[in-house]
Amino acid sequence: MTRGRLAPTPTGYLHVGHARTFALAAARASAGTLLYRTEDLDAGRCRPEFADAAIEDLRWLGLKWTEGPDVGGPHAPYVQSQRLPWFQNVWSQLQAAGAIYPCDKSRKDVERSLTAPHAEDDAEPIFPPALRAPLGAGRE
């Protein structure tokens, strides 16, 4: 099954690019489901009226999703900030398993590494390989 997701940040009115992206995702997911989740983690700038307007604008364009804040579904909640307890639970599980470890690299270190030439490998994660410490390194 294919699942697509649109997650606009309600810091302003929906941009036409969001609608285009969502329309493409909807077309590609024709054999699956499409999930709408509001990315409201920028608490200082996100406003409920923009979240409501995004849904209204996409509905006006005739776009439909299978799951979302306005229709519900099995993977609720569909407002990202309401999912924090789920993330905290996963964090606790990882912590209990000893799978959380600190990274001693700054954002500048990571940015610098991303601009350095290195081999392309689609199977590699985006985080620069040269900055990856062995699992558990730095733990006491």
Segments the model singles out, each with a brief description of its role:
Residues 107-140:
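Active-site cores that bind ATP or allylic diphosphates and position pyrophosphate for catalysis
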